[in-house]
Curated annotation (Swiss-Prot):
Something else known: This function is generally fulfilled by the C-terminal part of HisG, which is missing in some bacteria such as this one.
Top-rank lineage group of the source organism: Bacteria
Species this protein is from: Brucella anthropi (strain ATCC 49188 / DSM 6882 / CCUG 24695 / JCM 21032 / LMG 3331 / NBRC 15819 / NCTC 12168 / Alc 37)
Gene Ontology cellular component annotations, sorted alphabetically: cytoplasm
Protein name (Swiss-Prot/TrEMBL): ATP phosphoribosyltransferase regulatory subunit
Cytoplasm as UniProt keyword: yes
Subcellular location: Cytoplasm
Amino acid sequence: MAGSSSSGVFNSLRATLDMREAELVEIPLIQPADPFLDMAGEDLRRRIFLTENENGDSLCLRPEFTIPVCRNHIALNAATPKRYAYLGEVFRQHRDGAAEFLQAGIEDLGASDEAASDARSIADALSCVRAAAPEAELEIVLGDQSVFAGMLKALGLPQGWRKKLLRSFGDANSMEQVLAELTGAQRRDPLPETLAGLVAEGDESGLARMLEAEMLEAGISPSAGRSPAEIARRLIEKEDLAATRFPASALDLLKQFLETRVTLDSAAVTLRAFASEHALDLAAVLQKFEARSEAIANAGIATKDIIYDASFGRPLDYYTGLVYEIRAPGVEKEGVLAGGGRYDRLLTMLGASENIPGVGFSIWLDRLQMLVGEKK
């Protein structure tokens, strides 16, 4: 296993979590696979260990904690606000190296003060990392899904393109492809005639049935990645969007925005100046951005030491605002020790009867061990 449950890092994290006013929750190793297949990103879906029970239900080894912690909260019909801590194994397939890792984190559900709970999440994550690696050189990088969404709206992009760009936010290669599609610069391979007709008619259910049949004929499980229904929806959406083009001047502004990378203490001023110069209405999202920055400073974290990167996000539908990472030079996976963010849509997507906002983070213990020189 990558990371040891008897290491100094493990023990320091356990002690720190115990002091963060969060209930340590036990989550079963075997989980229903569908929530992860439906909501997780493309990279995680490919790495899930899948199996079936005797009834044919898709199951998996726990690939992460956020989704099952939220499902557990819904199942218990627990009151909010509620904070959950976790520390345990996650399982992800890799071509080489370990497939079992230790993760720790906190999920903060139902807090009414968004700015304060965002700041607390960063402070909690930083405290956990610092407890294990007090002398490490760290970098905090922060992004904001809502500022990016506000930028797309201010530019007047159609809803379909906004959704497509939001799904690519944080994935540089995917974003580049979508921007190329917007300018008409990308050539698209023609669809097989049998599929093209259904796409042209917008027959999503018929297209999904045909895709599922072709997958089964080819020996591909329809639950191994994107579902036939999701593929059908995206094919039809892509065809609709192909007819839409956007002014080059607006795309240039979007690219300029995505190149913004400044310290958090100057980020709001930089963004307001950009909005004013180009007559963009970002007032509402920047008001929330400034409130969070103030809350972060009030939590004792120097905003001059945090980088705001306008292109940093996560290509997952349920992230709605803050996203962040704590990084260290020389550590694998681009130095990422911890990652977190706000996911106000997730619990509703998982079946909650009311809107429950959430923010949380996960820490990779094996990377922390590497940083402090512990043997795995």
